[in-house]
From Swiss-Prot:
This is Small ribosomal subunit protein uS9. The keyword Ribonucleoprotein applies. Keywords: Ribonucleoprotein, Ribosomal protein. It comes from the Bacteria. The keyword Lipid metabolism does not apply. Disulfide bonds: none annotated. The lineage of its organism: Bacteria, Pseudomonadati, Pseudomonadota, Gammaproteobacteria, Vibrionales.
Length: 130
């Protein structure tokens, strides 16, 4: 592995992302595709770029990302978490800024399981008085 490469693992829902950061020109590659090509929707692209915009390093770092599992939203969240961790490895002084924005904390919310006798996790069958 290169000397000036920094790594972070991010997770969200059932997605896991591995993020490699190195000094560069702001090139973001996700699963061998560009950011805009991988995430069609602008919302997901915005979520991915949030930690970089916060510390003003969008044009200063190149990112190589592999992500597996889950859907679009979960993958975007996992990538954001991974980028945050890699940035903290790159420069520890960024931690308080990223912490204040809420990017350091792993979002532990998961899909609640379906229960027996119910239609969904909490949705009960329709009640009939007679």
């Amino acid at each position: 592995m290169a000397e000036n490469q920094y790594y972070g693992t991010g997770r969200r829902k059932s997605s896991a992302a591995r993020v490699f950061i190195k000094p560069g020109s702001g090139n973001i590659v996700i699963n061998k595709r560009s950011l805009e090509e991988y995430f069609g929707r602008p919302t997901s692209c915005m979520v991915v770029k949030q930690p970089l915009e916060l510390v003003d390093m969008v044009e200063k770092l190149d990112l190589y990302i592999t992500v597996k599992g889950g859907g679009i939203s979960g993958q975007a969240g996992a990538i954001r978490h991974g980028i945050t961790r890699a940035l903290m490895e790159y420069d520890e002084s960024l931690r308080p800024v990223l912490r204040a924005a809420g990017y350091v904390t792993r979002d532990a919310r998961r899909v609640e399981r379906k229960k027996v006798g119910l239609r969904k996790a909490r949705r009960r069958p329709q009640f009939s008085k007679r």
